């Protein structure tokens, strides 16, 4: 379920060097149909046996398509900026022995290290629930890591295709900077948000920015694919921090550094917390039957002993089929303990350890999905505005991508028995 070596946090300097991990928001530890090859919910970036990074070198200004094609066919990496039918700027890239490059995108072609497809909220991302038209770029972005300490990771919009080229056509937003070098934006953009205070219990949301093809930082465009770029933010960089969020317009990724993962609870810790709750034998206050969180191996079917909760008040019960207040709102129930009316849902333990900002007990549930995690983690994600569509932002559950609702977006759970 997790990347090799995740549990071996005790030796962060052990070879091979891990730069960090990318975790896709909306999945609770694995893809619904299982992690396969380069398509998975979590991807570890390790130092490569041999550097594969590239850096800009020669710039060509070309007036004919044939000349442009001749340069792009030389076998070197290049970025082409088409200014008009009669003018293209081609920037050649040469080998960089000091960096490793990792590429992310929707394409399954070999240059892509981590294949990402559109996330469907509620984790209904199955073969039956296909996106009709993806908004994620086939070659969405690239992450370049320094091979020497402190192993800095930087993000750039767009990735090189199978011909080692990046093409920015006539309609793409592109420009020449005052220092003379060309730059541009991809169609739907690559957005990044660095949390203030790192990825800890005290973290606060940062500001969403757009990253250019050359790695500069800009304010957001008016809409996702607008022609006019935002304003250059000279005080910020494209260096990824622990907890940085990367949005590819269809999927959002969380970047965790190797050091950050070293201080993150492991799957074993979350399993121990689950067993601790179950060992306390919480009871349904009405039926007095014992409740138990199901095993971490994710199941679609709700189990008989699974705890349910009224999300308006937080009271935890076993399942019962009464308390409906109306036929139109099938999920609205009246809590028998306090008479509060609201959603009544099964509770699922949040199993993806990378989303936790602390190692606290699972005491809070997101509304309306019922995923449970620590108080600090629930409150952190409840205040993070995640991009949705082409210009909207809203908070969402990191474990299933469901849009959050309610006053606080999460609720403290009230268990009957010795837990509280």
Curated annotation (Swiss-Prot):
It catalyses: S-ubiquitinyl-[E2 ubiquitin-conjugating enzyme]-L-cysteine + [acceptor protein]-L-lysine = [E2 ubiquitin-conjugating enzyme]-L-cysteine + N(6)-ubiquitinyl-[acceptor protein]-L-lysine. This is E3 ubiquitin-protein ligase pellino homolog 2. Keywords: Phosphoprotein, Transferase, Ubl conjugation pathway. Residues 15-202 form the FHA domain. Interacts with TRAF6, IRAK1, IRAK4 and MAP3K7. Interacts with BCL10; this interaction is impaired by SOCS3. The atypical FHA domain contains a 'wing' insert and mediates binding to threonine-phosphorylated IRAK1. The gene is PELI2. One of its GO terms (biological process) is protein polyubiquitination. GO terms for molecular function: ubiquitin protein ligase activity; ubiquitin-ubiquitin ligase activity. InterPro entries: Pellino_fam, Pellino_FHA, Pellino_RING.
């Amino acid at each position: 379920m997790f990347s090799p070596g995740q549990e071996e946090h005790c030796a962060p300097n052990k070879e091979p060097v891990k730069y960090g991990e990318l975790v896709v928001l909306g999945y609770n530890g694995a893809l619904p149909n299982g992690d396969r090859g380069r398509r998975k919910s979590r991807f570890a970036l390790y130092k490569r046996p041999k550097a594969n990074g590239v850096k800009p070198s020669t710039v060509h200004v070309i007036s004919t398509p044939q000349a442009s094609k001749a340069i792009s066919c030389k076998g070197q990496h290049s970025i082409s900026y088409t200014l008009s039918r009669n003018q293209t700027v081609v920037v050649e890239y040469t080998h960089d022995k000091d960096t490793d490059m990792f590429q992310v995108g929707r394409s399954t072609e070999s240059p892509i290290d981590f294949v990402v497809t559109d996330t469907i909220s509620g984790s209904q991302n199955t073969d039956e629930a296909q996106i009709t038209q993806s908004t994620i770029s086939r070659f969405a972005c690239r992450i370049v890591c320094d091979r020497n300490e402190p192993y800095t990771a930087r993000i750039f919009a767009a990735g090189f295709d199978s011909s080692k080229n990046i093409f920015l056509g006539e309609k793409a937003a592109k420009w020449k900077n005052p220092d003379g070098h060309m730059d541009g934006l991809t169609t739907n953009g690559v957005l990044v948000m660095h949390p203030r205070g790192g990825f800890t219990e005290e973290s606060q949301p940062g500001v969403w920015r757009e990253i250019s093809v050359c790695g500069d930082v800009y304010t957001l465009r008016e809409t996702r694919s607008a022609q006019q770029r935002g304003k250059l933010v000279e005080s910020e960089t494209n260096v990824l921090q622990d907890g940085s969020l990367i949005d590819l317009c269809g999927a959002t990724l969380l970047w965790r550094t190797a050091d950050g993962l070293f201080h993150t609870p492991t799957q074993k810790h979350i399993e121990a917390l689950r067993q601790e709750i179950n060992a306390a034998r919480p009871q349904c206050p009405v039926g007095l039957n014992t409740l138990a969180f199901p095993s971490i191996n994710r199941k679609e079917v709700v189990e008989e002993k699974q705890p349910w909760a009224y999300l308006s008040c937080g009271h935890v019960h076993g399942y019962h089929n009464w308390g409906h207040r109306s036929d139109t709102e099938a999920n609205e129930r009246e809590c028998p303990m306090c008479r509060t009316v609201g959603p009544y849902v099964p509770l699922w333990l949040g199993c993806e350890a990378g989303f936790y900002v602390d190692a606290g007990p699972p005491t809070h549930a997101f509304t309306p999905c019922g995923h449970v995690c620590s108080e600090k983690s629930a409150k952190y994600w409840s205040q993070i505005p995640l991009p949705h569509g082409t210009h909207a932002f809203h908070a969402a559950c990191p474990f299933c991508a469901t849009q959050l609702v309610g006053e606080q977006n999460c609720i403290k759970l009230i268990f009957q028995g010795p837990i509280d």
